[in-house]
Amino acid sequence: VSADRGAAPTAAPATVAAPPAAPATVAAAGGAEREPAYTVERLERAQDLPRQVWDELAPADDPMWGRDVFTAMQAAEIGPDAYAYLLVREAGRPFALLPLSAVHGLRLDRVVGPRERRLMAPVARAFPRLLRVPMLFCGNFLGQGHVMGRGRLPAAAARLLVREVMDFARGHRLGTVVFKDFAPDGLDALRPGLDEQGFFTVASLPDTQLTLGQTDFESYLASLPAKPRRNARNKLRKFHRQENLRMEVLDEFGHLVPEMMGLYRQVMDRADQTLDVLDEAFVRALSDSTAAGAGAEDGDAEGQGDGDGEGARTEQRLVACFEGERLVGYLHCLFRGRGAVGARIGMDYGLAHRARLYHNLHYAAIELAIARGCRHIRFAQTAYEPKREFGCALVEQSYALNHTGRLPRTILRLLLPPALEAARAQALAPRS
């Protein structure tokens, strides 16, 4: 894996050969017909797959799966040390793609709940290296897990793909392997490969998703149950009573990125868990890529840009709150197809409470998504109580976990499920 995320590799993408035990051609039941041959090829960068092919494989309405998001991750330092992409071909044709993110020193005390972090604190002080583990994340490091593809992954392809994942982990000394935040149907398609390799599953934190379809924001408010509707109107009134505060929606905000990062750090300093921490390079790279339109990009294997269908490219807007000319809050929103994501938030906690800033930033994002005709908007895996009040449903998802060593795998099976389940229960518990 290239450790230089920002530079294009000089060599052609490596090809990962299927092991001899798994022939590329598998006979169908009864031997009367033969299934297509499946092979797996390793790509070093998202740009190594033509944009047109990426958009054919990626979830059409999930903004976190636009190719621009992955190229921005490669250019930044948000947690992973390196990236790779396993491309499944069916009879030579691109059929599915699984992104991989390698973290060689994941800090365990940053990805557990507050109680577990307190228990780990003495170890973290005395032996900090003991809490750093090499880990391979499969799927989207910043979003819900998927295997991008043209359809459900056949069992033969699933076994080959998961086998290649484990070979990749062994080859790069990444002991723990995680298929991160996959929905049940996504894991079901991978089940033949996961079971063959000894993976086990644990429920992860659910996503929150608000189904849309209202004609305007007032219709959305009217659709809420009585108590959340009263609370929403009360919070909107409190915001509008504040002097010199205003909400804007910006499509260009590069000049605000330094202020955004300061507000984002205020939120992250108060976060229970910090698997990923975005940096200025990520925000700028994403802004630059989405502003490029449908033109050719450096390193695009096609170089033409004519494969982009309408809405295929990830778009972004900044829901920004200003006090005078000073940015005091924002919600960074991404759009793709008919889906929206409130990706990351930043706030000045000096006025967040009295202005009900958290709620009002989300209300503005919901209004924006409705105006754009989105079918749904998703928010981060935090602050579940207010998101239930917004009308969001919980989207259940899971981890599939494994280890390249037999003894560590046994220990993981014993210790990790109760720790993750406790952290999940604490995150979902009512706060009032």
Residue ranges and their predicted role:
Residues 36-116, 166, 175-353:
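A conserved beta-strand-loop-helix scaffold within acyl/acetyltransferase catalytic domains
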Residues 265-272, 288-291, 326, 332-333, ...:
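Hydrophobic alpha-helix feature that most strongly marks membrane-spanning transmembrane helices
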Residues 2-9, 27-38, 102-105, 144, ...:
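Active-site/acyl-donor-binding loops of N-acyltransferases
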Residues 81-84, 89-90, 95, 101-201, ...:
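Acyl-donor binding region in acyl/amide transferases
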Residues 71-74, 117-119, 126-133, 208-212, ...:
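Short C-terminal domain-edge/linker segments immediately following a structured domain
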Residues 5-33, 292-313:
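Intrinsically disordered, low-complexity terminal tails and inter-domain linkers enriched
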Residues 1-8, 24-32, 120-136, 165, ...:
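Intrinsically disordered, low-complexity boundary segments flanking structured domains
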